[in-house]
UniProtKB/Swiss-Prot annotation:
Source organism superkingdom: Bacteria
Subunit field text: Heterotrimer of UreA (gamma), UreB (beta) and UreC (alpha) subunits. Three heterotrimers associate to form the active enzyme.
Gene coding for it: ureC
Binding site for substrate: H221
Enzyme class, broadest EC rank: hydrolase
Pfam families referenced in this protein's UniProt entry, alphabetically: Amidohydro_1, Urease_alpha
Major subcellular location class: cytoplasm
NCBIfam families in the record: PRK13206.1, PRK13207.1, urease_alph
Protein name: Urease subunit alpha
Pathway involvement of the protein, from the record: Nitrogen metabolism; urea degradation; CO(2) and NH(3) from urea (urease route): step 1/1
Cofactor(s) demanded: Ni cation
One GO term (biological process): urea catabolic process
Residues the record lists as binding Ni(2+) 2: K219, H248, H274
Length: 570
């Protein structure tokens, strides 16, 4: 006999469905479920007296006959392509489908088969997102990786060799020997990793050898001398080997101004770090490059969003990170030239317009590794409060804005760095790097972080308790973070050139090396999803006032933020 459930009762049992709305943490962002893949009355749920039992929601199919390894049931998916409710199937560490799970022997419309060998993760009332990608990493200490994983990041790309002076300031792993050792160290972590070589050179030989050694990108940094000659040389080498170039431009304008740097690009594709400029770059107008078709711009999280405390914390941060001495007037002037409230305020709005395309951390080098996701949603919330709904959000929800902002730390860095075939979104065929959230803690503290199909990090109670939930409940590494599981569920990104030179055979590594691809000529800002706007940006050199297509971009600093102290009492 059919039974009609009231919406609250249905949501309590199976999670929200089409037309229901969910608040994200304590923000003013509300999503609405656009589609539910289930068949009402055929929902699957695990537990005593529930559906997923032998002969009911669980069939007899073996893995060889098509059963999934894992099914995440009834999850609300937030991704760049939409906001839906569905079951998600995982197999051999990858996503095999998004749809309706169950037993096709007795249920109609089954896309994903539950068999005796299928594990279940309950997604009812929870939100599922793709694992985050932080593309601005200073590999200063290995402990960063657990911190990133705990926040919901599953891919880290950058450079460094540990707490060396060069690494404190620049995201470079310089030279073949260092690159090889860092790739070998990757086996010890449940995290996709990629390493950038040093790109500052005026001759190509020193750059090519780093690519052959395994660098998946090259980084141009002003502390090593980002001159027009170095920019031109680095981009030429990158074009030859299909890798991305990241740039931190010349704050002091010693070797040229922003216009000279743009000329050195010669229209070639480049990833511009901390494009606002507080993290470094031509003062005061580096942000002009965010309007160019060949520049893929990102932010780092200390300036995200603009608050009453942003300016004060930046000066000391900058002095430490760039090996400056506050007693030297020139060093102090260098630091102060980079910190401008006008451009930081404009950065908020350019993100909301989709003109700044990515978020990242700048880990321990003017950025916080564990706060990329939180700062992204704080920025989105601040813009909702100050600017109101986006024009695209006409249905009394924030779906478009939410899709725009999630793309900034998932699919867009994956596209930029040539790995979107493997990661960056919840789509069939991609690595099962997934994060499950309780809506009240969305963007702050994940329930589960799934790495390559295996739970690698989770909120967990007292291990000596009789049940999993007694206090203290906090994030802890799970089995996916140990032993050989780490190498079987994570990737190291490198170059096609390195693999052609036998890198896998040369190094003592167990995990798979995957080449980056499609990072050059055909990759333009319009390739970046929901974040490809290219306004004409002007910055007054005297007042620092920012205009986009003639409109002054300014907003007030926030005095308080969501996703902050109420979530971090201990």
């Amino acid at each position: 006999m059919a039974v009609t459930l009231p919406r609250p009762a249905y949501a309590g049992m199976f999670g929200p469905t089409t037309g229901d709305k969910v608040r994200l943490a304590d923000t003013e962002l509300f999503i609405e479920i656009e589609r539910d893949f289930t068949l009402y009355g055929e929902e699957v749920k695990f537990g005593g007296g529930k559906v997923i039992r032998d002969g009911m929601g669980q069939g007899q199919a073996s893995k060889a006959e098509g059963a999934a390894d894992t099914i995440i049931t009834n999850a609300v998916i937030i991704d760049h392509w939409g906001i839906v409710k569905a079951d998600v199937g995982l197999r051999d560490g990858r996503i095999i489908g998004i749809g309706k799970a169950g037993n096709p022997d007795v249920q109609p419309g089954i896309d994903l088969i539950i068999g005796p060998g299928t594990e279940i993760i309950a997604g009812e009332g929870r939100i599922l997102t793709a694992g985050g990608f932080d593309s601005h990493i200073h590999f200063i200490c290995p402990q960063q990786i657990e911190e990133a994983l705990a926040s919901g990041m599953t891919t880290m790309l950058g450079g460094g060799t540990g707490p060396a002076t060069g690494t404190f300031a620049t995201t470079c792993t310089p030279g073949p020997w260092h690159i090889a050792r860092m790739i070998e160290a990757s086996d010890g972590f449940a995290m996709n990793l990629g390493f950038a070589g040093k790109g500052n050179a005026s001759r190509s030989e020193g750059l090519v050898e780093q690519i052959e050694a395994g660098a998946c990108a090259l980084k141009l940094h002003e502390d090593w001398g980002t001159t027009p000659a170095a920019i031109d040389c680095c981009l030429s080498v990158a074009d030859d080997h299909d890798i991305q170039v990241m740039i931190h431009t010349d704050t002091l304008n010693e070797s040229g101004f922003v216009e000279d740097t743009i000329r050195a690009f010669k229209g070639r594709t480049i990833h511009a770090f901390h494009t606002e400029g507080a993290g470094g770059g031509h003062a005061p107008d580096i942000m002009k490059v965010a309007g160019l078709p060949n520049v893929l711009p990102s932010s780092t999280n200390p300036t995200r969003p603009f608050t009453v405390n942003t300016l004060d914390e930046h000066l000391d941060m900058l002095m430490v990170c760039h090996h400056l001495d506050p007693s030297i007037a020139e060093d102090l002037a260098f630091a102060e030239s980079r910190i401008r409230k006008e451009t930081i305020a404009a950065e908020d709005i350019l993100h909301d317009l989709g003109a700044l395309s990515m978020m990242s951390s700048d880990s321990q080098a003017m950025g916080r590794i564990g706060e990329v996701i939180t700062r992204t949603w704080q920025t989105a919330d601040k813009m909702k409060r100050q600017r109101g709904p986006l024009p695209e959000d006409k249905s009394n929800n924030d779906n478009f804005r939410v899709r725009r902002y999630i793309a900034k730390y998932t699919i867009n860095p994956a596209i930029t760095h040539g790995v979107s075939r493997h990661i960056g979104s919840i789509e069939p065929g991609k690595l099962a790097d997934l994060v499950l959230w309780t809506p009240a803690f969305f963007g702050v503290k994940p329930d589960l972080v799934i790495k390559g199909g295996m739970i690698a990090y989770a909120m967990m109670g007292d291990p000596n308790a009789s049940i999993p939930t007694p206090q203290p409940v906090h994030g802890r590494p799970m089995f996916g973070s140990f032993g050989g599981a780490r190498t079987g569920t994570s990737l190291t990104f490198t170059s096609k050139t390195a693999l052609a030179h036998g890198l896998a055979q040369k190094l003592k590594i167990s995990r798979k090396l995957v080449p980056v691809e499609n990072t050059r000529g055909n990759l333009r800002k319009t390739s970046l999803i929901l974040n490809g706007a290219m306004p004409h940006i002007e910055i007054d050199p005297e007042t620092y006032v920012v205009k986009a297509d003639g409109m002054v971009l300014t907003c007030e600093p926030a005095r308080s933020l969501p996703m902050a102290q109420r979530y971090f009492l201990f």
